[in-house]
Amino acid sequence: MSITVLDPGPLTTVQDAGRVGYAAQGYRSCGAADGYAYRLGNVLVGNDPGAAVLECTLRGAALRFETDTVFALTGAESPAALDSTPVPYYAPLLAKAGSVLQMGAAKTGLRSYLAVGGGIATPPVLGSRATDVKCGIGGLEGRKLTAGDTLPIGSCDTAALWQAITAKRLDRPLRDKAVCGGLHPMRVQGTQMLPLLRAVPGPQDAAFTVQGRQDFIHGIYTLTPDCDRMACKLAGTPLQMRRGADILSDGIVPGSVQVSADGQPIVMLADHQTTGGYAKIATVISADLPSLAQLRPGQRVCFTFVTPSRAVQAARQQAALWQRVRDRL
């Protein structure tokens, strides 16, 4: 069972839940940038939520299924067609052997996910198939995909899986925006509705002046072109510090908001480094990282502080949404 890459688009990689437990050795976790869309895709095709998928950035890939395959598309929606017939997102679909899936440019959002029954079965490295392009490990030879690549698919009884899906009438697109990840906290700023990223105070929040902390939660920030899978660099009112931005390097997690010497926030994403030497004013909660991962350069965001207990509650609520879909299968 396999998939052949005909056109990889700008950036398509194999990703899973990430390489956990090796930060002390300098290995980054990597994994899907939009963890919610990633998990939802897997549960739609009957996989374990941690199975490997394809992540496409800005524009999707063109792929040929070499065997009958159940698949699902989630994340940033783009025009998609299977053998020239339009197909929806957020629905289990059946591709026959030899069928070609073509994905266009995302209409909104940034990253799309293709999950297949059985999962992408490239060799795991340190317990994960996640591609780390900078380190050259995971995925397919530790690199982004190119035309002509062949990706193995894990063992799956496709006929039985599709029969179970159709018998339960699950082969229809999900319409609930909350379940599809389409509902995110927003804030009214003047005449605008802006994505609101919730955060807990960072380990060095005391390094910032009262005015600096106020500017952080009341300001508007624009995503700069310097955004990738590693981090989103923002531009807005410079945040005032009591002393310089540099600190003794310490640990970094997804969502860490470092502030560079120019006073601008940098929010860490999936490919973040393991340590950093800039003061961290906040940490974006895990439930809101999928929202950030789908924003494009030029879009604007704002922040608010929440308590750790509210952060845990939001994570549990988000997990319950995709678990609801899993329970139906």
Residue ranges of model-derived segments:
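Conserved "landmark" site that anchors the functional core of diverse proteins
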Residues: 1-329
